[in-house]
UniProtKB/Swiss-Prot annotation:
InterPro entries given in the database record: Adipolin/Erythroferrone-rel (IPR052136), C1q_dom (IPR001073), Tumour_necrosis_fac-like_dom (IPR008983)
Stored Gene3D superfamilies: 2.60.120.40
Site description Cleavage, residues in chain: K97, P98
Gene: C1QTNF12
Gene Ontology biological process terms in this record: D-glucose import; establishment of localization in cell; gluconeogenesis; negative regulation of gluconeogenesis; negative regulation of inflammatory response; phosphatidylinositol 3-kinase/protein kinase B signal transduction; positive regulation of D-glucose import; positive regulation of insulin receptor signaling pathway
UniProt source species: Homo sapiens (Human)
Record-given protein name: Adipolin
Subunit relationships: Homomultimer; disulfide-linked. May interact with ERFE.
Post-translational modification: Processed into Adipolin fC1QTNF12 and Adipolin gC1QTNF12 by FURIN. Insulin enhances endogenous C1QTNF12 cleavage.
Region of interest (Disordered), residue spans: 28-68, 86-110
Compositionally biased intervals (Basic and acidic residues): 86-100
Record's keyword terms, sorted: Disulfide bond, Glycoprotein, Hormone, Secreted, Signal
Biological classification of the source: Eukaryota, Metazoa, Chordata, Craniata, Vertebrata
Tissue and organ distribution: Predominantly expressed by adipose tissues.
Induction: By insulin in subcutaneous adipose tissue.
Length: 302
């Protein structure tokens, strides 16, 4: 009977005794540990290796999935790669590049000075002026024409000789348009019979006259005087003294029987005004203007 009682006690108190034994063994292990030491946490090794720069690869949990495992292993392989001196040298040389330069990548461009900027500005101003001037002329030019159209121009010759008495002023008339190639008569401003060119519009005109003067009557006579001269004039409205005129003066001391007297220049005419050629004989003998003497004019612009 007593045996059965002890057996029942052992069955009931056995688990409690085993638990008390485990607790006692743990306390004994803590007593035997040195005072300066402390137990490392389970992840102490991983933390130390991460502080050294080479983290250990913890085992990925099974619930992370294959994608997370592959990415994690790739990162660890990159961190644990061998020390490549060439790669480090290349990266180091890249860091040594100057960082104080602004602008797009590449070698620096040429230095731009104030003189260069001024020259470029002058070129731009010149181009703008040419474009503006071309735009002003476009309405006056026919489509597709690259040259300026001359609206009024003429070249005519004296049809016959013209006698000029001494001390007289004579207006030349009786011109004709030459039939030879090269002569021209453009516009309707010239009257060949009267020898007058009437301006169709107000503008600046260029005129010229080339007269062949015959002074054969003076040869063999008394010595020429200082006032024995001949003048060729191109006058406006036949008023040579009131308006501006083109004038050429020549003496009569030439040894030849005939000499040529020329005059040319620019005159501004208003619409309706005319210009013509005059000969002023200041000598004491009769002069003759030979046939073939020419008179020409051209409208330069308005």
């Amino acid at each position: 009977m007593r045996r059965w009682a002890w057996a029942a006690v052992v069955v009931l108190l056995g688990p409690q005794l085993v638990l008390l034994g485990g607790v006692g063994a743990r306390r004994e292990a803590q007593r035997t540990q040195q005072p300066g030491q402390r137990a490392d946490p389970p992840n102490a090794t991983a933390s130390a290796s991460s502080r050294e720069g080479l983290p250990e690869a913890p085992k990925p949990s099974q619930a992370s999935g294959p994608e997370f495992s592959d990415a994690h292993m790739t990162w660890l392989n990159f961190v644990r790669r061998p020390d490549d001196g060439a790669l480090r040298k290349r990266c180091g040389s890249r860091d040594k590049k100057p960082r104080d330069l602004f602008g797009p990548p590449g070698p620096p461009g040429a230095e731009v000075t104030a003189e260069t900027l001024l020259h470029e500005f002058q070129e731009l101003l010149k181009e703008a002026t040419e474009r503006r001037f071309s735009g002003l002329l476009d309405p006056l030019l026919p489509q597709g024409a690259g040259l300026r159209l001359v609206g009024e121009a003429f070249h005519c010759r004296l049809q016959g000789p013209r006698r000029v008495d001494k001390r007289t002023l004579v207006e030349l008339h009786g011109f004709q348009a030459p039939a030879a190639q090269g002569a021209f008569l453009r516009g309707s401003g010239l009257s060949l019979a009267s020898g007058r060119f009437t301006a169709p519009v107000s503008g600046i005109f260029q005129f010229s006259a080339s007269l062949h003067v015959d002074h054969s009557e003076l040869q063999g006579k008394a010595r020429l005087r200082a006032r024995d001269v001949v003048c060729v004039l191109i006058c406006i409205e036949s008023l040579c003294q009131r308006h501006t005129c083109l004038e050429a003066v020549s003496g009569l001391e030439s040894n030849s029987r005939v000499f040529t007297l020329q005059v040319q220049g620019l005159l501004q005419l208003q619409a309706g005004q005319y210009a013509s050629v005059f000969v002023d004989n200041g000598s004491g003998a009769v002069l003759t203007i030979q046939a073939g003497s020419s008179f020409s004019g051209l409208l330069l612009g308005t």
